[in-house]
Design a protein with these regions (language model features):
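Short, Lys/Arg-enriched N-terminal segments with co-localized hydrophobic residues
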Residues: 5-18
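Basic, flexible Lys/Arg- and Gly-enriched helix-loop patches that mediate nucleic-acid binding at interfaces
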Residues: 19-261
């Protein structure tokens, strides 16, 4: 049984544009936002994917003209995956645990679920299985961290083509160099590459507001160092349309079914 969901890219040859070379089905599914490549391989292996009506096989290649269908089991598995919003405290790492430091996912327990969570999702230990951070937040930073089982959300937030905004409040010390604020907005480079334009404004005499559309390692701290400032506190308060809001530090809640980044 298949769903009435058809995923197909435009027929480029109809516009006089040469067809692209065939690529792996799993890559095409990720490009279309159906799921992550790892999830695609799992669905294909289970026989949950059809190409032009025929059950797909691992390693199969497709073109933009091919029709891709997911069956009911794949759709149900996606629907059961959860995304969790955590207000990460200092001292926890976003990803795998490191020496002397705990992983943020260890905070996802029934006891730490925020009593203001209105999602009506009952916590189950399986919700921590394959739960991965969709983006980093430094060990010495606090605020909104997204942990998800859904590869589509991870791709949206941290994929190569991600354009999701991330908003931060940043406390600083030091003396801002001449033209420093303008450089923070546009004109700095890290790791030999120009940074995308940002939105950086003063909130008060020692706090800046950053809105970024990329996430290089320790990006804000390194940007500030380039203009004579030292970051003494960093808090992420928004990712896309999802705000940290009143979520207490160390607590978490589920992303609601109608929640969209």
């Amino acid at each position: 049984m298949t769903l009435n969901l058809v995923f197909r890219l435009p027929h480029s040859h109809k516009k006089g544009i040469p067809m692209t070379d065939p690529i792996r089905l799993s890559k095409r599914m990720a490009e279309l936002g159906i799921c992550s490549r790892r999830e695609a391989d799992s669905y294909i292996e289970k026989g949950w994917v059809r190409v032009n009506g025929t059950v797909a096989i691992l390693g199969q290649k497709v073109t933009p003209a091919d029709r891709i269908d997911l069956n009911k089991q794949a759709h149900e598995q996606q629907a059961n995956r959860v995304t969790i919003l955590l207000n990460k405290p200092i001292g926890f790492v976003s990803g795998q645990p490191e020496k002397d430091y705990r992983a943020a996912v260890e905070l996802i327990t029934a006891e730490n679920q925020w009593d203001g969570d209105t999602s009506r999702i009952a916590f189950h230990p399986s919700h921590t299985r394959n739960l991965a951070p969709a983006g980093r937040l430094d060990i010495d930073s606090v605020g909104l961290l997204v942990l998800t089982q859904d590869g589509r959300i991870a791709k949206q937030l941290i994929g190569d083509n991600s354009n999701s905004e991330k908003e931060y409040l940043v406390r600083v010390k030091g003396s801002l160099k001449e033209n420093g604020l303008a450089l923070l907005n546009h004109g700095l480079s890290l790791d030999g590459e120009p940074l995308r334009p940002a939105q950086v404004t003063w909130q008060n005499q020692d706090q800046l507001r950053f809105v970024l559309r990329q996430g290089k390692k320790r990006q804000i701290r390194r940007m500030c160092e380039l203009v004579g400032l030292r970051v003494v506190g960093l808090k992420r308060i928004r990712i896309g349309r999802i705000k940290l809001g009143a979520l207490p530090q160390g607590k978490w809640r589920y992303l609601q079914a109608n929640g969209r980044f």
